[in-house]
């Protein structure tokens, strides 16, 4: 009873604080809610969706993407010209374009970003892997040469252009280890990060030097909540205006909430079961059960997993069954793999029998040569759907003699486990985990790159290495003929399905929601007509086009001038709810912040 009283008081305090009394500055504020915040906001070391949501509003690309159809559109560059042999692209930058701090944007910023930032970052290096030289004959001209034709240089060079006069003051070692940008974070986008309160708020304010049309909102507030339930509750209470990523478990409920519109759209994203395949040569100090590197074991696990059931239960039917590395979102490149691993427990048992994995005396976990088919399965505490999927994988594989010990850890801990290094070499400390990847909406290259050898130490999380896959990757990246490229990509997908560094469980939809009494009906973009409403991992155009409803229609927008006190009280309310056990809780162990789920 006492806990409920505290909750009521806390919520009352929040609602009182959120009243229009705090709208005296008259600013229009777009309030976004999330349960997971960026780690450092450094493009050198971070790779999570939340980072991209902020980066894409803070920084421009050399060439942007139209939110209508994802075609190339001016960014830092005003125009570009491709040579007849398609190996040289000359870019002309906008004249008079300035960073948010007033410094001019020049070709040297592009040169720094593509020569220093991208190759040394965790995620962006693949976009410039074919670049042989970058010349800057004057402040407004950039000439990029490649070793082979690469369509991504114009149509998919997704590497943010950073201000060299800011980032260039740090050494590469500092940038890739310890450096964290601090507000105001100099940028070229419509808003820049002006305030960071860890665990509470990231405030973005309008960039006075933004080149494009002035956006309707003066500020964007990214408000941190304790978990996804709290985020979605805040939307129904009107504390926030938009949830850019809604959980599958609550999507149907939000769709029925008053003054809330829930939006479902296709996306180039999937959720996968990942196996640690790092070789001793590449990862001499890695920690994992060697049995996980037996391909027959991985194939048997794939046959034992009912992907349809995982979608129905874990994703609440909002996703689709996974069929290999590429989602069918990429219609120009998708073709069902040669081996799709339909549910077949008998086939799974047969594979393990033939590989010499024998049932133990009690008929439980299989064994061979002193090894048991018992693996850790890590999953993020921030994702209820992933936790449910992990439990289902454990249940589904028990009949074939495989035992998964599900370990729920924070996203920071899982990142640490999967990216651990010793003496400069990768040393991942896991057997398996469940997480997900989102590809570029305009090209499958980013997802294909995940399984290349050169991605190890960067975006690779399975540490898969196959020279034939690498050769095919290089071949397709320089192929401009769509039909020929599709045939090469098909070979890559079949290789990945044979070796199974990933078992793709589901192809995920983009699920979002917004307040109809706060936000004027937005366009569905990236691409039109049935894409999402923010497109905020690709660029800023869709968010910059959002508008509050008119004052006559309900006064939305102007009452968004919420003070810092409101966010403190919101956090207090969430804390009280957690203490009362009314929200999803997360227990931690001191040694690994993990909870082993025995049941």
Regions found by a protein language model. Name each.
Residues 1-7:
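Bacterial N-terminal signal peptides that target proteins for export
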Residues 8-17:
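Bacterial N-terminal signal peptides
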Residues 19-23:
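Sec/Tat signal peptide C-region and signal peptidase I cleavage site
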Residues 24, 68, 94-125, 133-136, ...:
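Extracytoplasmic/periplasmic ligand-capture domains
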Residues 24-30:
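Cleaved targeting-peptide boundary
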Residues 25, 92, 126-170:
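Surface-exposed binding/hinge segments that line
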Residues 33-84, 115, 184-187:
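N-terminal lobe/hinge region of extracytoplasmic solute-binding protein
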Residues 505:
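Active-site-proximal polar cores
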């Amino acid at each position: 009873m006492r806990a409920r009283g505290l909750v009521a008081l806390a919520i009352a305090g929040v609602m009182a604080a959120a009243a229009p009394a705090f709208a005296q500055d008259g600013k229009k504020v777009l309030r976004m809610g999330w349960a997971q915040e960026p780690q450092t906001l450094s493009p050198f070391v971070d790779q999570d969706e939340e980072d991209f949501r902020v980066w894409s509003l803070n920084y421009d690309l050399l060439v942007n993407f139209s939110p209508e159809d994802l075609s190339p559109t001016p960014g830092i560059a005003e125009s570009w010209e491709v040579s007849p042999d398609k190996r040289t692209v000359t870019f002309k930058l906008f004249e008079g374009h300035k960073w948010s701090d007033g410094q001019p944007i020049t070709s040297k910023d592009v040169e720094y970003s593509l020569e220093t930032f991208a190759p040394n970052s965790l995620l962006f290096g693949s976009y410039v892997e074919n670049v042989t030289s970058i010349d800057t004959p004057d402040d407004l001209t950039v000439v990029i040469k490649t070793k082979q034709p690469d369509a991504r240089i114009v149509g998919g060079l997704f590497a943010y252009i950073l201000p060299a006069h800011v980032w260039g003051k740090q050494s590469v070692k500092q940038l890739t280890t310890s450096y964290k940008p601090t507000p105001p974070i100099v940028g070229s986008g419509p808003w820049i990060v002006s305030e960071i309160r860890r665990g509470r708020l990231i405030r973005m304010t309008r960039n006075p030097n933004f080149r494009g049309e002035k956006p309707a909102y003066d500020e964007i507030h990214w408000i941190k909540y304790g978990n996804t339930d709290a985020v979605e509750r805040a939307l129904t209470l009107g504390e926030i205006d938009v949830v850019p990523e809604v959980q599958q478990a609550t999507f149907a409920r939000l769709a029925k909430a008053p003054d809330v519109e829930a939006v479902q759209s296709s996306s180039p994203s999937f959720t996968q079961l990942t196996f640690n395949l790092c070789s001793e040569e590449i990862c001499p100090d890695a920690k994992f059960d060697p049995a996980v590197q037996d391909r027959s074991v991985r194939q048997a696990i794939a046959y034992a997993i009912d992907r349809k059931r995982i979608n129905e239960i874990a994703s609440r039917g909002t996703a689709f069954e996974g069929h290999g590395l590429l989602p069918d979102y990429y219609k120009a490149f998708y073709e069902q793999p040669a081996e799709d691993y339909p549910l077949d427990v008998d086939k799974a048992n047969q594979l393990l029998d033939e590989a010499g994995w024998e049932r133990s005396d009690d008929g439980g976990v299989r064994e061979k040569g002193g090894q048991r088919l018992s693996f850790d399965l890590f999953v993020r505490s921030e994702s209820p759907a992933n936790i449910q999927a992990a439990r289902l994988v454990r249940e589904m594989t028990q009949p074939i003699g495989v035992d998964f010990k599900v370990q729920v850890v924070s996203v920071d801990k899982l990142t640490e486990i999967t990216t651990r290094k010793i003496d400069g070499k990768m040393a991942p400390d896991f057997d398996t985990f469940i997480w997900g990847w989102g590809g570029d909406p305009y090209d499958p290259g980013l997802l294909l790159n995940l399984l290349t050898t050169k991605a190890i130490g960067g975006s690779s999380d399975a540490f898969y290495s196959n020279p034939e896959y690498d050769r095919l990757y290089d071949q397709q990246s320089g192929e401009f003929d769509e039909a020929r490229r599709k045939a090469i990509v098909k070979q890559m997908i079949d290789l990945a399905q044979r070796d199974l560094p990933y078992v793709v469980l589901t192809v995920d939809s983009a699920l979002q929601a917004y307040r109809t009494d706060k936000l004027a009906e937005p366009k569905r973009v990236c691409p039109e007509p049935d894409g999402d409403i923010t497109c905020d991992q690709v660029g800023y155009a869709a968010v910059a086009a959002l508008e509050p409803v008119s004052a006559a229609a309900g006064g939305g927008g102007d009452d968004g001038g919420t003070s810092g006190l409101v966010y403190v009280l919101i956090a207090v309310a969430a804390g009280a709810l957690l203490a009362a056990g009314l929200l999803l809780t997360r227990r931690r162990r001191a040694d690994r912040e993990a909870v082993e789920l025995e049941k």
